[in-house]
């Protein structure tokens, strides 16, 4: 945003000089990027007339021009512009002048053998517009008698270039900047009252906003001014327009541009006599075209906001007008538009069509929706003052009402955030100067937010405004505490890191995948919960939050199988999502293994990974984490995505409080659906949220190995019991007879058949007895044998096989 100090003082009564104003702007967050001096730099650019234009003797695209620069003087200039011709009025820069755009200093030079004294300038080179296809063409009726005069007014002024952040659209007008400076104590904001208009008649041009889906225009104000004389702008207006790098065109156009930069209120002017019947604000239809004021034809997409009449599109709402109803010097009747357009719609349409205008820049950031009347008042007054004419009543069409937002602000929050305090009365004064409407109610401030501040919506925004105006230098510099506090982790975090190491130590590779997954695969691993769909997924195959990590791991395992790898072990610890409510997100350690078990010795036989291997991995990890193996309870229930006969679940005790793990073969039906060709695929899930604090600290996992100097003994037992009896209970019963002596209980045979009653089975177990204090005698061993038999028969109903 560019401003001049003189223009700023139209709104701000201040005693500060320019340098002090620049410093204050930066202090309040309106960073000054640079100051361009216009005093003297443009004095040498004069109005000139081409007397003769001949083809260059050695270059087809160059012309040698004789140029009249006033006072009977003419100079030779070599020019490459295609529009350089005899009789053209343009702008000449002599040797020594500095071109505004490139900052290049001109010198006398030879171009293909012909000496050129200076340069004929395009509008782009003079920063008047983006037009660079040819040299500037000046109107003969306006400039014919001014040959030799300076084109730019001789004013001693500097242009201050301010960097406006995207949230501060209100400062894209001079008044918004003045308001901030006044609030910061740089002066007093001048109350500008418009002259009361003598509105003769009603506005006779019908305007209608189509209330349709995605309508970007919520309000459209218009004012008809009849009998105007669209003339050249007065010097004061031209000075302001030129200072900001704009080209004066005509009084009506210059007035609309001036109000946009002055009040941040974009306007548009229509030649009423070129409008076909009525104006309709509607959504465009795909394929509609119109010629814009930049002389380009645009082809529109669906649902772009357009201003139209019976003959078609007149302009793209809030972005650019069309040539068909543009005002000319002979315009007699003009309709002024002051409307509000949705920032999102403006941003979308301008991006598709690749259009960038000053109006678009403001609308896409959000202008004041309640400034429609203000814009019409200022425009009607200036047009009537400069161009004459009769002003109609204002016509305001709306499809919804805009109300100011409000919030409650607790002043104590300011000190909590900033570290320093200001008096509540000073807070009220600052906010009042910024345009807030404040009422104090029992120490709380009820604040109505200014309509031009869409960026303010919560208390912290108010804190930011207060500290910005009061000054960031008020915040005291406090050295950070150098005492480093001991970092503490909760149980789940400790388990997370411990299980990472524990599972990896068993030959698993850790994978890190998205928390998103493909709904088609996720459905295979859902039990009773519902999927959580992602509204705007980063990919079509990552469209839901995963219910199980299996849905990610199984895909990556299959990719590795496809690359020729067979024996694979992956795990991941991360979140799963069973619902959208609090507590329905779980942290789960999940693993998959496929192929054959790695042999520990060449003497061992190769075999496929099975359910017992993955069960062992889970139990070992839990034991290493500090949970008592003897307290773990296992049964054969598991979710439907496990093989029903080769799976199970683990509880921390027999009371079955919460499942801490599932394990087993992955269901063959899932492998078939996913076309996974593998001989064996087993998996596990450990639920960290269901694990209670272990009695043994996670720090105390490495315990001293207790070895014995005494010989161990082995005893084999065979028990006959019910066919459906779970072996785990039998093993636990034997282990609990004497935990110090009994080191191992393993099943080595299961028999059904001759000599075994129907409905029964024989289970043979090997028991290792390891004394720590003395060698056991035969009597000692017989006592232990009898204790084992008695315990099994009394607790399980089994009988020793004879």
Swiss-Prot record:
Task: Quote the record's cofactor note.
Answer: Binds 2 magnesium ions per tetramer.
| tRNA-binding domain location | 39-152
Q: Where is the FDX-ACB domain?
A: 708-801
Predominant location category? cytoplasm
Q: Where is the B5 domain?
A: 402-477
Q: Which Pfam families match?
A: B3_4, B5, FDX-ACB, tRNA_bind, tRNA_synthFbeta
Supply the alphabetized keyword list.
Answer: Aminoacyl-tRNA synthetase, ATP-binding, Cytoplasm, Ligase, Magnesium, Metal-binding, Nucleotide-binding, Protein biosynthesis, RNA-binding, tRNA-binding
An example of a Gene Ontology cellular component annotation for this protein is: phenylalanine-tRNA ligase complex
Q: Which GO terms describe its molecular function?
A: ATP binding; magnesium ion binding; phenylalanine-tRNA ligase activity; tRNA binding
The source's domain of life comes to Bacteria
Report the EC code(s) recorded for this entry.
6.1.1.20
Alphabetized SMART domains for the sequence: B3_4, B5, FDX-ACB
Q: Name one GO biological process term.
A: phenylalanyl-tRNA aminoacylation
The cofactors required by this protein are:
Mg(2+)
Reaction equation(s) it catalyzes: tRNA(Phe) + L-phenylalanine + ATP = L-phenylalanyl-tRNA(Phe) + AMP + diphosphate + H(+)
Q: Where in the cell is it found?
A: Cytoplasm
What is annotated about its quaternary structure and interactions? Tetramer of two alpha and two beta subunits.
Q: Which protein family is it in?
A: Belongs to the phenylalanyl-tRNA synthetase beta subunit family. Type 1 subfamily.
Task: Name it.
Answer: Phenylalanine--tRNA ligase beta subunit
Lineage, opening ranks: Bacteria, Pseudomonadati, Pseudomonadota, Alphaproteobacteria, Candidatus Pelagibacterales
């Amino acid at each position: 945003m560019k401003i001049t100090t003189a223009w700023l003082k139209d709104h701000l009564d201040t005693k500060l000089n320019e340098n002090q104003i620049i410093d204050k702007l930066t202090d309040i967050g309106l960073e000054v990027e640079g100051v361009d001096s216009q005093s003297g730099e443009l004095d040498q650019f004069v109005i000139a007339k081409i007397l003769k234009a001949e083809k260059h003797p050695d270059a087809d695209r160059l012309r040698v021009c004789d140029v009249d620069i006033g006072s009977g003087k003419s100079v030779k200039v070599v020019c490459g512009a295609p529009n350089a011709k005899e009789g053209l009025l343009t702008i000449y820069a002599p040797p020594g002048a500095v071109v505004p755009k490139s900052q290049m200093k001109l010198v006398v030079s030879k171009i293909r053998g012909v000496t050129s004294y200076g340069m004929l300038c395009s509008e782009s080179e003079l920063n008047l517009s983006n037009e660079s296809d040819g040299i500037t063409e000046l109107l003969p009726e306006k400039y014919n008698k001014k040959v030799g005069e300076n084109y730019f007014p001789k004013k001693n002024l500097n242009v201050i270039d301010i960097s406006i952040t995207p949230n501060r659209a209100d400062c894209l007008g001079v008044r918004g900047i003045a308001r901030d400076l006044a609030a910061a104590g740089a002066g007093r904001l001048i109350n500008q009252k418009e002259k009361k208009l003598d509105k003769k008649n009603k506005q006779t041009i019908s305007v209608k906003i189509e209330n349709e889906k995605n309508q970007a225009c919520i309000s459209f104000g218009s004012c008809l001014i009849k009998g105007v004389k669209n003339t050249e702008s007065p010097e004061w207006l031209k000075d302001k327009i030129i200072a900001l790098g704009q080209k004066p065109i005509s009084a009506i156009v210059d007035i609309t541009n001036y109000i946009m930069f002055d009040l941040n209120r974009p306007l548009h002017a229509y030649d009423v006599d070129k409008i076909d019947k009525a104006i309709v604000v509607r959504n465009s239809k795909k394929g509609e075209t119109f010629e814009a004021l930049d002389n380009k034809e645009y082809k529109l997409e669906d649902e772009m906001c357009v201003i139209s009449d019976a003959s078609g599109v007149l302009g793209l709402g809030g972005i650019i007008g069309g040539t068909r109803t543009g005002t000319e010097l002979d315009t007699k009747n003009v309709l002024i538009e002051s409307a509000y357009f949705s920032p999102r719609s403006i941003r979308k349409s301008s991006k598709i069509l690749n259009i960038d205008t000053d109006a678009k820049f403001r609308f896409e950031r959000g202008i004041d929706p309640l400034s429609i009347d203000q814009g019409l008042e200022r425009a009607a007054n200036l047009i009537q003052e400069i161009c004459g004419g009769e002003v109609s009543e204002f016509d305001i069409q709306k499809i919804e009402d805009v109300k100011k937002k409000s919030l409650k602000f607790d002043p104590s929050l300011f000190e909590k955030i900033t570290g320093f305090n200001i008096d509540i009365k000073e807070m009220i004064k600052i906010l009042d100067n910024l345009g807030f409407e404040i009422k104090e109610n029992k120490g709380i401030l009820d604040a109505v937010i200014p309509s031009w501040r869409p960026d303010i919506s919560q208390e912290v925004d108010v804190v930011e405004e207060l500290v910005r105006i009061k000054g960031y230098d008020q915040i005291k510099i406090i050295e950070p505490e150098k005492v480093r506090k001991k970092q503490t982790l909760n149980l789940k975090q400790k388990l997370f890191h411990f299980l990472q190491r524990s599972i990896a130590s068993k030959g698993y590779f850790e994978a890190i995948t998205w928390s998103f997954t493909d709904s088609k695969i996720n459905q295979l691993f859902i039990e009773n919960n519902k999927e959580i769909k992602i509204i705007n997924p980063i990919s079509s195959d990552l469209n839901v939050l995963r219910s199980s990590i299996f849905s990610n791991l199984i895909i990556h395992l299959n990719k590795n199988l496809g690359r020729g790898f067979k024996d694979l072990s992956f795990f991941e610890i991360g979140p799963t999502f069973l619902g959208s409510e609090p507590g329905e997100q779980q942290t789960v350690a999940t693993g998959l293994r496929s192929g054959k078990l790695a042999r520990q010795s060449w003497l061992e036989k190769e075999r496929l990974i099975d359910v017992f291997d993955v069960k062992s991995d889970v139990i070992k990890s839990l034991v290493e984490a500090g949970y008592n193996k003897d307290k773990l309870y296992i049964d054969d229930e598991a979710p439907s995505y496990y093989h029903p006969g080769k799976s199970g679940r683990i509880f921390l005790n027999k009371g079955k409080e919460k499942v801490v793990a599932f394990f087993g073969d992955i269901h063959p039906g899932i492998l078939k659906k996913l076309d996974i060709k593998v001989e064996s695929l087993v998996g596990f899930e450990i639920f960290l949220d269901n694990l209670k604090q272990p009695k043994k600290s996670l720090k105390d996992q490495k315990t001293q190995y207790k070895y014995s100097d005494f010989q161990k003994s082995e005893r084999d037992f065979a028990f006959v019991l019910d066919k459906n009896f779970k072996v785990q209970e039998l093993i636990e019963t034997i282990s609990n007879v004497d935990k110090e002596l009994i080191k191992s209980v393993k099943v080595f045979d299961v028999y059904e058949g001759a000599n075994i009653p129907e409905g029964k089975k024989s289970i043979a177990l090997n028991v290792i007895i390891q004394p720590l204090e003395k060698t056991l005698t035969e009597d000692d061993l017989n006592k232990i044998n009898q204790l084992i038999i008695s315990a099994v028969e009394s607790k399980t109903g089994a009988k020793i096989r004879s």
